[in-house]
Curated annotation (Swiss-Prot):
Cited function: Converts stearoyl-ACP to oleoyl-ACP by introduction of a cis double bond between carbons 9 and 10 of the acyl chain. Also able to convert palmitoyl-ACP to palmitoleoyl-ACP at the C9 position. Exhibits delta-9 palmitoyl-[acyl-carrier-protein] desaturase (PAD) activity. Involved in omega-7 monounsaturated fatty acid biosynthesis, especially in the endosperm oil.
Keywords: Chloroplast, Fatty acid biosynthesis, Fatty acid metabolism, Iron, Lipid biosynthesis, Lipid metabolism, Metal-binding, Oxidoreductase, Plastid, Transit peptide
Recorded catalytic activity of this chain's protein: octadecanoyl-[ACP] + 2 reduced [2Fe-2S]-[ferredoxin] + O2 + 2 H(+) = (9Z)-octadecenoyl-[ACP] + 2 oxidized [2Fe-2S]-[ferredoxin] + 2 H2O
Null mutant phenotype: Reduced omega-7 fatty acids accumulation in the endosperm. The endosperm oil of double mutant aad2-3 aad3-3 lacks omega-7 fatty acids.
Any one GO molecular function term: stearoyl-[ACP] desaturase activity
Binding site for Fe cation 2: 178, 231, 264, 267
Name the record gives this protein: Stearoyl-[acyl-carrier-protein] 9-desaturase 3, chloroplastic
Organelle targeting peptide span: 1-35
Annotated site residues (Confers substrate specificity) in this chain: 216
Induction: Activated by MYB115 and MYB118 in the endosperm.
Length: 401
């Protein structure tokens, strides 16, 4: 089953976006209609307004749905975050840097020799692996979007750009750690000579310009559930690219991917710890938030990926990742099972409302439902031949989905 079947948005429709935003402390909601005005429909594709629209539809979005009393929870957690969350960050002086894995440019002979070694090691690695590695790198390079999105979360966002709130410190320092991932993969891929860097760079620019449809609703419950899921997903993905790099004989690339995976695991632990604390303080609100996010579907952060050519680029990248075993629908179900165990969702008892109990029942049966869907999808896939798609990232060569 393609990861995209579970994690992507429907194709973009040409219509105004509608954003629904409840006023804090009141039940009515505001509906803000946002549209791009064009004077000549025949030139629609050339209008600046549409030129920067995401290639996929960003559905109607709710904003600021968390009530004030829930925001107070995050204020009360600041001492906890200072003591329990920030220690998951590494001091800069103790952290690895991309240059630790790359040829040193100050010595001409050594630099050129090491670049030749990289190109020799990677020349026989198949295109499908590079498609997935590039997709992973592009996802990491869209980091400005992720920091921006975290700073939309009420109660924890960096209000000034330099706030000393532990939540704001975490967001900035987490971003700084993550920044090394895309930087390192980008430089290594450039040195291999195996990918079309201009098309890769275009994809990064398109993706950052498109943003992401997070479905957070400015709600930190939703935001931290999402990041818990995504950090585990990236841990799995980078771990599998490390394993495949070893199989293909590139020990350095395996070490790069493994090092990034270790960072993602540490970040996963931190985010799951936040949600674990929320389940302790507010089990009813937490289980409802988790069920809500799963019903809306946890979409991958790069689901608006586009290279200027392929309108279904993310779906195609996801299909290749599924086929070569880097990230699969089974992983998606496995992550949910892991988080349900980690947060002890099945054993929640006292303190749940009727809606909370219904959310609990839904969540506890969801992994098996996902697995059954995967099995049926896999059975259907076996009956049809797998198509190939041209990827601009590998100079337009066809890669099997």
């Amino acid at each position: 089953m393609s990861m995209a079947l579970l994690l992507t948005s429907p194709a973009m429709k040409q219509k105004p976006a509608v954003i629904t935003s409840p006023r804090r402390g009141s039940s009515p909601s505001r509906r803000l209609r946002v549209s791009c005005v064009t004077t000549n429909p025949a030139r629609k594709k050339n209008e600046t307004c549409n030129h920067f629209r995401p290639i996929k539809e960003v559905n109607n979005q709710l904003t600021h749905t968390i009530p004030q009393e829930k925001l107070e929870i995050f204020k009360s957690m600041e001492n906890w975050a200072e003591q329990k969350l920030l220690p998951y960050l590494k001091p800069v002086e103790d952290s690895w840097q991309p240059q630790d894995f790359l040829p040193a440019p100050e010595n001409d002979d050594e630099f050129y020799d090491r670049v030749k070694e990289i190109r020799e090691r990677t020349k026989e690695i198949p295109d499908d692996y590079f498609v997935v590695l590039v997709g992973d790198m592009i996802t990491e390079e869209a980091l400005p979007t992720y920091q921006t999105t975290l700073n939309t979360l009420d109660g924890v966002k960096d209000e000034t750009g330099g706030s000393l709130s532990p939540w704001a410190v975490w967001i900035r320092a987490w971003t700084a750690e993550e920044n090394r991932h895309g930087d390192l993969l980008n430089k290594y891929l450039y040195l291999t000579g195996r990918v079309d860097m201009r098309h890769v760079e275009k994809t990064i620019q398109y993706l950052i310009g498109s943003g992401m449809d997070s479905k957070f609703e400015n709600n930190p419950y939703n935001g931290f559930i999402y990041t818990s899921f995504q950090e585990r997903a990236t841990f799995i993905s980078h771990g599998n690219t490390a394993r495949l790099a070893t199989t293909y004989g590139d020990v350095t690339l395996a070490k790069i991917c493994g090092t990034i995976a270790a960072d993602e695991k540490r970040h996963e632990t931190a985010y799951t710890k936040i949600v674990e604390k929320l389940f302790e303080i507010d089990p009813d609100g937490s289980v409802q938030a988790l069920a809500s996010m799963m019903k809306k579907r946890i979409t991958m952060p790069a689901h608006l990926m586009h290279d200027g050519r392929d309108n279904d680029l993310f779906d195609h990248y996801a299909a290749v990742a599924q086929r070569i075993g880097v990230y699969t629908a089974a992983d998606y179900a496995g992550i949910l099972e892991f988080l349900l165990r980690r947060w002890k969702v099945e054993s929640l008892g006292l303190g749940l409302s009727g809606e909370g109990r219904r959310a609990q029942e839904y969540l506890c049966t969801l992994p098996q439902r996902i697995k059954r869907l995967e099995e049926r999808a896999n059975d259907r896939v076996k009956l049809v031949s797998k198509p190939s798609v041209s990827f601009s990232w590998v100079f337009g060569r066809d890669v099997k989905l």
